[in-house]
Amino acid sequence: KTDFAILDTHNYGGIKKYHLVTLPLALHGVIAKKDGTVVKVNVGDKPGDPVFGVSDLLIHLSGEQLEKKAAKVIEGENLDLLIGSIPMQTEDEKVKEKVKANIMNLLSKEYGIEEEDFLSAEIEVVPAGEAKDYGFDRSMIMGYGHDDRVCAYPSFEAMLVSENPEITSVCLLVDKEEIGSVGASGMQSRFFENTVAEVMAAAGSYSELALRRALANSKVL
């Protein structure tokens, strides 16, 4: 594997792993550097960007693989992202993984990041390219994540176009739904209830009973 630079990944939520093989992939996310600065990462979507991928066996080498069930054709541990194959041109014998060294050199020049910075990074691997109209009649959308986006975007758009609502309106956008809504920003947390309590306190009308009544009188779409 030292002939290639590979990112070790972990699949997020329930996915059909074989969908991601030999597909152009992009990197989205943020990297928090040791000096505290945050670098935004978005590589693979813009014209001229490189893309990345998960390699697969050639057809004449995949006889055993093709006998497996769909759930086992590509294991989660095999969803490693291929990001480069050119070794660094150096005579330094201390540099053992020359392809990796070359990639890290490129990342240092482009983003000013080091290998240790990946410890505080949150990067997701997604299909490259923008969402597109699907079908001659353009009646559908082809793009990843639209089981959630089809709900999130109309909700946010409705908030933007609403004028003088009779009651307080809230658009609640959360994540981690795919893995059980856990974490500080998932629905199992109390951040929404805490936010309502803070708003009520700022308005001078907070009490535990008033908070419970406000939540009980709310309507959710």
Regions found by a protein language model. Give the residues of each.
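N-terminal hydrophobic/helix-forming segments and targeting peptides
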Residues: 1-221
